[in-house]
Amino acid sequence: ATMVSVIDASATTEHELNITGLQTGTRYFYAIGSSTDLLSGPDSGQYFQTSPVVGSIDPIRIWAVGDMGEGNTNQAAVRDAYLNYTNNDHTDVWVWLGDNAYDDGTDAEYQTGVFDMYPTILPRTVAWPALGNHDYGSTHPFVSDNQDYLDIFTLPTAGEAGGTASGDEGFYSFDYGNVHFVCLNSENYTPMDLLLYPNITITHSPAMVTWLENDLASNTNTDWVIAYFHATPYADGTHSEAYSGSDPIKIVDGIIMRAMRDQFVPILENHGVDLILAGHSHDYERSYLTYGNYGTGGPYPPDSTILDGGTGRLSDGAPYQKMTSGPFANKGGVFCVVGCSAKTGSYTSDGPLNHELMIFDDYRLGSLLIEVNDNQLDAFFIDTSGTAWDEFTIIKDLGVTGIPTDPFPIPEEDESVFNNLSIYPNPIIDWFTIEYHLNTPEEVSIEILDLTGKTIATLINENQKVGDYTYTVDAKNTGIVQGVFLLQFKTAGELKIQKTIGQ
């Protein structure tokens, strides 16, 4: 093995060492010391692993924790559950969703809430943190007088790890394999905005907006985009973008959350974001595959904003699917609130979780494990029991070699009763056509369902012989208006469901 020494001779307690000449995708063991004393290492648990070649499709393991910096037994339980679930295997990317050290983000609180809490993980895992309001101080946004965060971390402001240079440690991007990560600063706004309380307007840094547009536009070498920051754009727990009560802190929080929703989510969605991670609300909430929701946060979503109303679970046979070309190219992403890695709210004090976009939610301690393998992303919410309480999968271009736009064929299954099944046009405007070949005589039912599974219209319910069938349907007469609907094809031994969109 080759030994290399890197020395910082300056008399300081804050050392930053720049190491050059490293190989991609390589594990390097290291030791830290002075000219007279060895402080730590070298040993098998103290190493760093360099990023793989950008665009490579090797499996990637990501760990997301949010609002974790309490230094308490809850935080330790979340940590241990993750380590046990993953058999203490290497984590490639560790993202922090803000509020990393309570209550004021001081150096001492980072020591107890972070460094003392992860003594075996930090020496071998690169952390990619986001700023939360408590990292500025407990009086933020009214007073922001603490920035120990910027002294503790050195973050890529010049595009050193991939992406576009931001010039600001509060927001940055990096590449790891075929994933592009974007970290935003949801707390980056001027305190002057708060003087208009309660009619506050929040305008985030124009520099961050411009940078995000440029960064995502230049991201052409990765297959996935994961964005993360602190103040979630959607939640219905301890904080909500739809809060309508009288608590001044929650009013301000709601305005900040809506600002992230309205100013940044459209940019992220327009550039094909796949997964958005955030914290702030002390619970776990996970959305459907969605696009373009800027509604009220109530329990009933505009149908057109939910692109897939299923569970997203591979175990249910219902993974979310995205296409990279065609009429729905790169549309849709999943939003996860993971503000529960050390504390949670409760149904008693904070009320029910009933957000229009969320399919699974709970006041439950835990963290999120994400695994990316080529064109498949799997996510698992690991609670303190050490099990996956929730999971979902996104697959890109599933079984597709040339993506048609019209007609829209349904993938065939071996020995299927239906062959050459297609629906066109899709999206539906006024009329649409259904075509299929029936392999065996069957009693056939074709129904239109809404996303809850309720039947809107029955198109066919009859015995049919072997042969080819074509039906042209007046969409308006069947109840299809703007939104997402399901077409259900059913026989005694087979059930197929195809999503369609009315315009």
PLM feature spans:
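Acidic, histidine-bearing metal-coordination/catalytic regions of metal-dependent phosphoesterases
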Residues: 1-76, 80-89, 225, 363, ...
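Residue-level detector of high-confidence beta-strand sites
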Residues: 6, 278, 286, 391, ...
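Extended active-site neighborhood of metal-dependent phosphoesterases/phosphodiesterases
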Residues: 27-43, 47-49, 107-221, 225, ...
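Conserved, compact domain cores that house catalytic/ligand-binding motifs in diverse enzymes
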Residues: 58-130, 135
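Active-site neighborhood of phospho(di)ester-bond hydrolases with catalytic His/Asp-centered motifs
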Residues: 64-66, 93-99, 126-133, 226-230, ...
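Solvent-exposed loop/turn segments at secondary-structure junctions
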Residues: 68-71, 100-104, 133-138, 181, ...
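A short C-terminal boundary segment appended to hydrolase-like catalytic domains
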Residues: 331-333, 339-408, 417, 422
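C-terminal outer-membrane/trafficking sorting elements
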Residues: 413-424, 428-503
